[in-house]
Amino acid sequence: MKQYLDLMKKVLEEGTPKADRTGTGTRSIFGHQMRFNLQDGFPLVTTKKCHLRSIIHELLWFLNGDTNVAYLNENKVSIWDEWADENGDLGPVYGKQWRSWGAADGRQIDQLKNVLTQLRQDPDSRRIIVSAWNVGELDKMALAPCHAFFQFYVADGKLSCQLYQRSCDIFLGLPFNIASYALLVHMVAQQCDLDVGDFVWTGGDTHLYNNHMEQTHLQLSREPRALPKLVIKRRPDTLFDYRFEDFEIEGYDPHPAIKAPVAI
């Protein structure tokens, strides 16, 4: 994951000091891209230990169309708790938009089912897209989508995906986002009888929070290790039937975890 460390260095050296919604302050650049060949290994950061349970359960939660933290809490995942209301609700965030986008005529559009249909029937389409950025519902969301828009692409029997992330917390959020979308590509590829290709990450406001600087320098002092391998143990009937125990990460040998505060 040298690309990830190189991004950290770039922001430290070239970033602009900026104020932000949380009041924490950041060092920021605008516009950056990284490409990960998923044939080379699973892109999980090794210079600190990442919490795999949270990454996998969060993605399964999105895929289920869920927007309440109860499922996450039942599985010892607390990454969304700070934004939930007293009932655990987050409003129409990712899961709602991915699985039941509300159309003007009252229809509920399942973007992910549409993607699967397109990949099977028209894999050369340039419209195989999922958007979480629903302008009409942003004010009802506990947190506006950071990873807002992604597109699939098929070439030579391989499935690739590009994500546009409008706002990126490099230290805490980005390792999760890369691993989550890489996992999604593997799952969709399995369901569509494709091999995996590239995951392309594109960032808008790409930043390090001022209270993550010590942790960033510690991480940069560590040498990256070999990427692990993702094993999917079974093929469920649909994309929406995967379970946590279906996934195994082989050969993950990270440096110790590094704690840092979340900007809310």
From Swiss-Prot:
Keywords: Cytoplasm, Methyltransferase, Nucleotide biosynthesis, Transferase. It comes from the Bacteria. Coiled coil: none annotated. GO terms for cellular component: cytosol. Its EC number is 2.1.1.45. Pfam families: Thymidylat_synt (PF00303). Gene3D superfamilies: Thymidylate synthase/dCMP hydroxymethylase domain. The active site is at C146. (6R)-5,10-methylene-5,6,7,8-tetrahydrofolate binds at H51, D169, A263. It is an enzyme of class 2 (transferase). It catalyses: dUMP + (6R)-5,10-methylene-5,6,7,8-tetrahydrofolate = 7,8-dihydrofolate + dTMP. Pathway: Pyrimidine metabolism; dTTP biosynthesis. It is found in: Cytoplasm. GO terms for biological process: dTMP biosynthetic process; dTTP biosynthetic process; methylation. DUMP binds at R21, R126, R127, R166, S167, C168, D169, N177, H207, L208, Y209. Belongs to the thymidylate synthase family. Bacterial-type ThyA subfamily. PANTHER family: THYMIDYLATE SYNTHASE (PTHR11548:SF9), THYMIDYLATE SYNTHASE 1 (PTHR11548). Catalyzes the reductive methylation of 2'-deoxyuridine-5'-monophosphate (dUMP) to 2'-deoxythymidine-5'-monophosphate (dTMP) while utilizing 5,10-methylenetetrahydrofolate (mTHF) as the methyl donor and reductant in the reaction, yielding dihydrofolate (DHF) as a by-product. This enzymatic reaction provides an intracellular de novo source of dTMP, an essential precursor for DNA biosynthesis. This is Thymidylate synthase.
